[in-house]
Amino acid sequence: MARIAGINIPDHKHAVIALTAIYGIGKTRSQAICAAAGIAEDVKIRELSEEQIDKLRDEVGKFTVEGDLRREVTLNIKRLLDLGCYRGLRHRRSLPVRGQRTKTNARTRKVHVSRSKNSRGK
């Protein structure tokens, strides 16, 4: 298994799909990384040479991924909480932040739902 950005990349998957195992890299960014590294998208990770894996590491290193990205997101939410702005209040109250309706939906954000509503009475 290749190790990129502190994550073991599954070597039985295609390069584009395998890179999405890294937090912060989706399919579009993965395609851009493969194109910049000069790697075909349909090549599996185990078929790559060590030089190609090093190129992938260099390209992934240009982005904020994994722990750094998680830390950045957490700090952004903490900043909103400290400011006391509307979005910060919504985070504090565990309500939807981006204007979604709460009269009917948003149950997963409002309360932890372990079972569906219909199975409660049974």
Curated annotation (Swiss-Prot):
<dbReference type="InterPro" id="IPR010979">
    <property type="entry name" value="Ribosomal_uS13-like_H2TH"/>
</dbReference>
<dbReference type="InterPro" id="IPR027437">
    <property type="entry name" value="Rbsml_uS13_C"/>
</dbReference>
<dbReference type="Pfam" id="PF00416">
    <property type="entry name" value="Ribosomal_S13"/>
</dbReference>
<dbReference type="InterPro" id="IPR001892">
    <property type="entry name" value="Ribosomal_uS13"/>
</dbReference>
<dbReference type="GO" id="GO:0005829">
    <property type="term" value="C:cytosol"/>
</dbReference>
<comment type="function">
    <text>Located at the top of the head of the 30S subunit, it contacts several helices of the 16S rRNA. In the 70S ribosome it contacts the 23S rRNA (bridge B1a) and protein L5 of the 50S subunit (bridge B1b), connecting the 2 subunits; these bridges are implicated in subunit movement. Contacts the tRNAs in the A and P-sites.</text>
</comment>
<comment type="similarity">
    <text>Belongs to the universal ribosomal protein uS13 family.</text>
</comment>
<keyword id="KW-0687">Ribonucleoprotein</keyword>
<dbReference type="InterPro" id="IPR018269">
    <property type="entry name" value="Ribosomal_uS13_CS"/>
</dbReference>
<keyword id="KW-0699">rRNA-binding</keyword>
<dbReference type="GO" id="GO:0015935">
    <property type="term" value="C:small ribosomal subunit"/>
</dbReference>
<comment type="subunit">
    <text>Part of the 30S ribosomal subunit. Forms a loose heterodimer with protein S19. Forms two bridges to the 50S subunit in the 70S ribosome.</text>
</comment>
<keyword id="KW-0694">RNA-binding</keyword>
<keyword id="KW-0820">tRNA-binding</keyword>
<protein>
    <recommendedName>
        <fullName>Small ribosomal subunit protein uS13</fullName>
    </recommendedName>
</protein>
<feature type="region of interest" description="Disordered">
    <location>
        <begin position="94"/>
        <end position="122"/>
    </location>
</feature>
<dbReference type="InterPro" id="IPR019980">
    <property type="entry name" value="Ribosomal_uS13_bac-type"/>
</dbReference>
<dbReference type="GO" id="GO:0019843">
    <property type="term" value="F:rRNA binding"/>
</dbReference>
<dbReference type="GO" id="GO:0006412">
    <property type="term" value="P:translation"/>
</dbReference>
<dbReference type="GO" id="GO:0000049">
    <property type="term" value="F:tRNA binding"/>
</dbReference>
<dbReference type="GO" id="GO:0003735">
    <property type="term" value="F:structural constituent of ribosome"/>
</dbReference>
<keyword id="KW-0689">Ribosomal protein</keyword>
